[in-house]
């Protein structure tokens, strides 16, 4: 089930509003959504487990909280999504989290992407600079079809 990116971002904002009540000023949130990507089709709730992981490992685990940046941009014929945090980070081996405590969110996300896009996707974890973790998703850019209405 795919939705327009603008719907996915709206759902993410609602979830993060709840988390902001919980963490108050300890949670910093930034959205960087490139104009023209709003109608891109993405799997429904694809950002949710990534944001939940960032909350759990980067914000809740730090006394001073943390920051989460959610980015979407076009790259050729692809859509790039990124959830980055400034938490303590994790041990990464070949783009995968090395420890077993990364939860099922990333595994489920990868399985969903594989089911929807076969081999035409990427899910990669990298170190955020100066600290933290970045989860990057690359999927084919597909735009929501707008209905033509008779004049």
Where would I find each of the regions flagged by the language model?
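Two-component histidine phosphotransfer core
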Residues: 1-136
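C-terminal end segment of the histidine kinase catalytic
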Residues: 128-151
